[in-house]
């Protein structure tokens, strides 16, 4: 079974957690090691269109995923980001939360991560994507934490 993420079909091999209403997947072009996404299962374009139970599940799942990626990738902090609508930088028309484990000094300016996320979401060159094998291996390593 594949997962819908906006205009994309996501292979189960890159999904490391599925809850009743959400799923988490590795990123094909991470801004930092461990940069993952958490999405509602239902393809909803804007945050205000989520039902209350979907909001609760999305953020409970995001919290669980954040704890795992911070530990697995030896982070000391987390950045959570959501672009809600085109003027906010949303390029995939499906609500999603970026979860990024952080370390001291990972960016010259701490807030540069937001500039990198903006560039990340606009640059869509398959040549810069990770291989399916690399993504599947990372998803498998993260999946262990949720079994």
From Swiss-Prot:
Residues the record marks as site: Important for induction of apoptosis: 114
Database matches in InterPro entries: Dinucleoside_ppp_hydrolase (IPR052677), FHIT (IPR039383), Histidine_triad_CS (IPR019808), HIT-like (IPR011146), HIT-like_sf (IPR036265)
Keywords, in A-Z order: Apoptosis, Chromosomal rearrangement, Cytoplasm, Hydrolase, Manganese, Mitochondrion, Nucleotide-binding, Nucleus, Phosphoprotein, Transcription, Transcription regulation, Transferase, Tumor suppressor
GO annotation terms (biological process): diadenosine triphosphate catabolic process; intrinsic apoptotic signaling pathway by p53 class mediator; negative regulation of proteasomal ubiquitin-dependent protein catabolic process; purine nucleotide metabolic process
PTM summary: Phosphorylation at Tyr-114 by SRC is required for induction of apoptosis.
Domain HIT: residue ranges: 2-109
Source organism superkingdom: Eukaryota
Segments carrying motif Histidine triad motif: 94-98
Catalytic residues, chain numbering: 96
GO cellular component: cytoplasm; cytosol; fibrillar center; mitochondrion; nucleus; plasma membrane
Expression across tissues: Low levels expressed in all tissues tested. Phospho-FHIT observed in liver and kidney, but not in brain and lung. Phospho-FHIT undetected in all tested human tumor cell lines.
Residues with Phosphotyrosine modification: 114, 145
Entry keyword annotation includes Phosphoprotein: yes
Residues given in the record as substrate binding sites: 8, 27, 83, 89-92, 98
Record note on what altering residue 10 to W does: Strongly reduces affinity for substrates and impairs apoptosis
Enzyme Commission number: 3.6.1.29, 3.9.1.-, 3.6.2.1, 2.7.7.51
Keyword Transcription: yes
One Gene Ontology molecular-function label: bis(5'-adenosyl)-triphosphatase activity
Reaction catalysed by this enzyme: P(1),P(3)-bis(5'-adenosyl) triphosphate + H2O = AMP + ADP + 2 H(+); adenosine 5'-phosphosulfate + H2O = sulfate + AMP + 2 H(+); adenosine 5'-phosphosulfate + NH4(+) = adenosine 5'-phosphoramidate + sulfate + 2 H(+); adenosine 5'-phosphoramidate + H2O = AMP + NH4(+)
Assembly: Homodimer. Interacts with UBE2I. Interacts with MDM2. Interacts with CTNNB1. Identified in a complex with CTNNB1 and LEF1.
Protein's job: Possesses dinucleoside triphosphate hydrolase activity. Cleaves P(1)-P(3)-bis(5'-adenosyl) triphosphate (Ap3A) to yield AMP and ADP. Can also hydrolyze P(1)-P(4)-bis(5'-adenosyl) tetraphosphate (Ap4A), but has extremely low activity with ATP. Exhibits adenylylsulfatase activity, hydrolyzing adenosine 5'-phosphosulfate to yield AMP and sulfate. Exhibits adenosine 5'-monophosphoramidase activity, hydrolyzing purine nucleotide phosphoramidates with a single phosphate group such as adenosine 5'monophosphoramidate (AMP-NH2) to yield AMP and NH2.
Annotated disorder: A chromosomal aberration involving FHIT has been found in a lymphoblastoid cell line established from a family with renal cell carcinoma and thyroid carcinoma. Translocation t(3;8)(p14.2;q24.1) with RNF139. Although the 3p14.2 breakpoint has been shown to interrupt FHIT in its 5-prime non-coding region, it is unlikely that FHIT is causally related to renal or other malignancies. Associated with digestive tract cancers. Numerous tumor types are found to have aberrant forms of FHIT protein due to deletions in a coding region of chromosome 3p14.2 including the fragile site locus FRA3B.
Name assigned to this protein: Bis(5'-adenosyl)-triphosphatase
Native species: Homo sapiens (Human)
Gene name for this UniProt entry: FHIT
